[in-house]
């Protein structure tokens, strides 16, 4: 696979995972997710990960 294919595959997998977690939250809480905020966590070598905050209505 080339870089673009790998990037597209990763984006699709991440989007599917987020959609699955939103559905689980909706089902388990009976409330809707109103916002998801991603904050980059960086090191000197570059992006390490993200902190995620979810708001539920």
UniProtKB/Swiss-Prot annotation:
Signal peptide as annotated in the record: none
Protein name stated in the entry: Protein GnsA
Family: Belongs to the gns family.
Described purpose of this protein according to its UniProt entry: Overexpression increases levels of unsaturated fatty acids and suppresses both the temperature-sensitive fabA6 mutation and cold-sensitive secG null mutation.
Superkingdom of origin: Bacteria
Organism encoding this protein: Escherichia coli (strain K12)
Any GO molecular function: identical protein binding
A GO cellular component entry from the record: cytosol
């Amino acid at each position: 696979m080339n870089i673009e294919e790998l990037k597209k595959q990763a984006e699709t997998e991440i989007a599917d995972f987020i959609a699955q977690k939103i559905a689980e939250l909706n089902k388990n809480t009976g409330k809707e997710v109103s916002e998801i905020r991603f904050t980059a966590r960086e090191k000197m070598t570059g992006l390490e990960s993200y902190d995620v905050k979810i708001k539920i209505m």
